C-alpha cells in the first residue's frame, strides 16, 4: 500500500503566501510582487521562528528571515505551470491537474448572450451586470431590487458571477436555486464561481448575511484526491478545500470559521484519522489581508499561524509527512488588490524524512501531488515529478 513508511500526509496551504514573482509575472501585471518579502519589508521585521526552523529562510529568493544552519525540514520553491493565478487553478495543479485555458473574466459586465440565457432559464430579469464591490452595489441597487424583485448581478476582477438578493424579497433557498441555474450557464462559459450573496436590512443599512454560498466549477479532470479516494484512502478537506475541488475526491469535509479554527480542525483530524491525506487551507491571509492590502494584518496572521506549528508537529507520528505550501501570491503592498503570479514555498517535514535537503526550484506545483501519489503507491498523476526519494533514501 505505497511507500511503507508513510501512512499519513498533512498538506497545509497558507493561502496566497507567494515568495517572489514568476518569470512571466509581467504578463499578469505582477512585476515586483513578492508577498512574503514585501510584508517583512513593510513591517521592518516579523517573528516566524517555527517556519524559520523548518528552513523557510533558506528558500531561494526569501529575504529577511533567518537562514538556519540545521533546518528540521527540507525546503524549496515551486513555479506554477498552469495559466492563471487563482485559488482553483493553484490547488488543482497541486493535485496534479494543469490548466492551460484561463477562466473567463468580464471586467465590463457579462455579454448579452450570457444574460439572455440567464433571463430565459431563471425566468426573471436582473439589475446591475457590472464589475463592482459587493457592499457598494447593494447600496446602489438594493432599493430598486426591493421594488422590482430582480436579483442584482455583478462580477469582479476574478472569474465570478455573483447574485445578490434581499432575504425578505427572495428566500435564500430560491436564491441558491437561481445560482444553480446560473452555474449551468457558467459551466458553458468557463466561469470559475457563481456566488449567492444574500443581504438584509433597510435602505441605508443593508448588510450581507453569512449565508453566502459558492457554486464552483468542478475540476476539469481527475485529481490526486479522486485517485486517493478511489484507492480507499481517507481524504479529509479542511476549510474551503471541498469547494475548490467541486466536493469531489473527499471522504470528509470540515468547514472552518478562520485560520485558528483551521488549525484546531487539523489537529482534531490528526487525532481522529490515522491514514490518508489531511488537506487544510488557511484562507484568512488571502481573504482578509492580501485582497484588502493590509500588510500588517497579514504579518500578524502569519505570526499567529507560526505559533501553532509546534502543536501540529507535536501530533505527528513517525509515519507522517507534513507539507507546507501556498497556491498563488496576493501581495498586500502593491496597488493591485488581486492575486499575484508568484513562486510558492515548499517545506517538507517528517520524523523519518531527511531534513535540510534543498529541493530547489520545482517546475510545477504538481510535484507535490506526484510525491503524495508515490508515497501512497497510487501510480502517476497527469503531471509532476516526485521528490520523495530525495527525502527517504538514506
Predicted regions: what they are:
Residues 1-394:
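Feature captures the catalytic ectodomains and active-site-proximal regions of enzymes
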